[in-house]
């Protein structure tokens, strides 16, 4: 395994990272308490990808490969965008790498990167959806990005893997069969299209599985059919499956990578994000608790709000009836926008793919209007933000904010 030495990483990073003149004084790296809390920020530059660690996201410090404990992970993620095919689960990173090797990594001593396990699949494997509400510390429940179209059955066969996190063995696999449409859609020129299914969400609620999915064209490589489709079946038997659909908001938003576009509220109502083809007009549909069909009396039109403009971050349930759909805090049940975090931070944009919650507070990274990167803490109870650690201005993207321990 090719893991670069930390010293070489820091020397190489010096050439292309610059520090703001008003940045915190970080002549000496912050010591890492080996038994205390540890957090990480996954950042990329034009030349590579780095894990930056800190004992606190809210301290007045600069997170940088030059002055902090940056870990060069470029050799494991051959392109920066592959961070969307990586996930942090209970302090361990799971990486799809180049699709040939699915790896488990840990940050050791706050400054080293170690592969602790790996799993090879028979075919290319890129990490898809994570069913976080049924995953545990011992078992990660996940999918791969692309299922298999069975033309004889006219279904998409989508496996769900139950992986033992101790040794990365597969405890079991469930194969969901999602029925495809029974007609052939047309292209704009009137010719027949060639559609395929992309699962956009996987949610288990009680004894039901809900699989949001959309259609794309093999010919144009674009999203098609402005209808939200969700496959509902019994769980875990997968029996009694049916398709429910709703055209009010367009197709079920998202793609097959990890980003999460559905959420359960405090009442266990399931919300499904929708989007119009060829636009950035989003909305929310609802499947009420105990129901297996869309609520005909509910649609939250978000076309006037540029959700996900610069971010495809995970939707977070904040509690007290609120949810974070970057960059907005919403009260979905009452169809209200509670806050715009871009305004609360004083101007900026979130550009992450993975934020996280701790002790009832949201942590996300924003690039301010002054082109400075900061971690911000949002308190849903008080509707206020606090600015935390600064991230080196030499980065061009921050993908993940994670807690490692």
Predicted regions and their residues:
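Bacterial Sec-dependent N-terminal signal peptides
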Residues: 1-40
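Intrinsically disordered, low-complexity segments enriched in Gly and acidic/Ser/Thr residues
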Residues: 30-34, 289-371
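Short, solvent-exposed loop/turn segments at conserved positions within beta-propeller repeat blades
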Residues: 45-50, 98-101, 150-158, 220-227, ...
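Post-signal peptide N-terminal segment of secreted/secretory-pathway proteins
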Residues: 51-162
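Beta-propeller blade signature
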Residues: 53-60, 155-169, 223-238, 282-292, ...
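Beta-propeller fold detector
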Residues: 62-77, 113-125, 169-188, 240-249, ...
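Repeated scaffold domains used in trafficking and secretory/extracellular systems
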Residues: 76-88, 122-137, 183-185, 195-201, ...
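Acidic, serine/threonine- and glycine-rich low-complexity intrinsically disordered segments
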Residues: 181-327
């Amino acid at each position: 395994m090719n893991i670069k030495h930390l010293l070489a990483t820091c020397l190489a990073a010096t050439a292309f990272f610059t520090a703001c003149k008003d940045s915190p004084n970080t002549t000496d790296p912050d010591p890492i308490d080996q038994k205390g809390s540890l957090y990480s920020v996954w950042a990329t530059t034009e030349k590579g990808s780095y894990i930056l660690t800190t004992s606190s996201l809210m301290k007045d410090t600069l997170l940088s490969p030059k002055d902090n404990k940056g870990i060069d992970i470029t050799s494991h993620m051959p392109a920066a965008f592959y961070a969307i095919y990586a996930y942090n689960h209970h302090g361990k990173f799971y990486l799809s790498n180049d699709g040939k090797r699915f790896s488990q990594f840990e940050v050791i001593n706050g400054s080293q990167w170690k592969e602790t396990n790996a799993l090879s699949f028979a075919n290319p494997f890129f990490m898809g959806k994570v069913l976080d509400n049924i995953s545990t510390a011992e078992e990660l429940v996940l999918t791969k990005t692309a299922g298999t179209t069975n033309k004889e059955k006219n279904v998409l066969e989508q496996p769900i893997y139950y992986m033992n996190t101790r040794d990365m063995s597969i405890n079991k696999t469930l194969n969901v069969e999602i029925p495809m449409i029974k007609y052939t859609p047309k292209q704009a020129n009137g010719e027949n299209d060639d559609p395929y299914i992309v699962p956009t969400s996987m949610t288990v609620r009680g004894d039901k599985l809900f699989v949001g999915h959309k259609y794309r064209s093999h010919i144009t490589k674009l999203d098609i059919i402005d209808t939200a489709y969700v496959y509902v079946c019994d769980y875990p038997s997968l029996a009694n499956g049916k398709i429910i659909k709703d055209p009010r908001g367009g197709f079920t938003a998202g793609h097959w990578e990890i980003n999460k576009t559905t959420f359960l509220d405090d009442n266990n109502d399931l919300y499904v994000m929708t989007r119009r083809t060829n636009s950035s007009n989003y909305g929310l549909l609802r499947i009420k608790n105990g129901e297996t069909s869309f609520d005909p009396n509910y649609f939250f039109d978000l076309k006037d709000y540029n959700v996900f403009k610069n971010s495809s971050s995970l939707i977070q349930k904040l509690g007290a009836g609120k949810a974070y759909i970057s960059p907005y805090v919403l009260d979905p049940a009452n169809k209200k926008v509670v806050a715009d975090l871009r305004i609360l931070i004083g101007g900026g944009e979130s550009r992450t793919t993975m934020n996280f919650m701790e002790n009832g507070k949201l942590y996300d990274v924003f690039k301010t209007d002054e082109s400075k990167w900061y971690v911000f803490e949002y308190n849903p109870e008080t509707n206020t933000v606090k600015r935390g650690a600064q991230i080196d201005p030499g980065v061009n993207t921050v993908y993940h904010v994670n807690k490692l321990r």
